[in-house]
Amino acid sequence: SETESENSIFDPDKMGSSVNSFLNKKNNVLFGSDYVYMKNFSDLDSATPEVQASQKYDGLPFYDDTAKIVFSLNKQDKSYAVTKYTQTHLSDIEQLREKTELHTEEDAIKTLYVNNKISRGSKILWRQLAYSCILKVREKNVYVPVWYVAIETPDKSIQVESVNAFSNTIVTNNTIPKVEDH
């Protein structure tokens, strides 16, 4: 849904707490307490600044178009005013397997390095563990924890690589396979 929002100002010096406080205030957004501010997936430097909050499950955010709020902002002096937001929300989330040990961010970075995804002279800007959709079965999405790693290459371009935190394998496919009953 897309909603006009009034009286919502975010302080850039305290963006995380400003956004999370706004999300947790009753009647600001539907299911606001289900979301958490995502600094690494927000962009305050563009001509059209945006802040993203992602829905979380069991403390871990989703990085997916089906579970986020994107706030469109207007810069005002030393703060940002929300002009509108778009929101998607997952309901009826089911855990499919028992909790298992995840590969660490260090494991993920080593996997990227060994597979030539981190070139010499590159710099890691940030790492984020989040759920990512890997499969759609009978209209239900299947999510796994994925390490997202932002890498600045020597030519100053930025690439975001992803590593499955269960299998420690690089996620390369952007299309999500669908399984249907026949």
Task: Show where each model-derived region lies.
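Aromatic/basic-lined ligand-recognition segments
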Residues: 43-75, 122-140, 144-147
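Structured segments of extracytoplasmic/periplasmic soluble domains
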Residues: 21-29, 72-74, 111, 115, ...
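Generic detector of bulky aromatic hydrophobic side chains
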Residues: 35-36, 74-77, 179
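Preferential activation on post-signal-peptide N-terminal prodomains/segments
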Residues: 1-43, 48-59
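Extracytoplasmic/luminal low-complexity segments enriched in Pro/Gly and acidic/polar residues
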Residues: 78-182
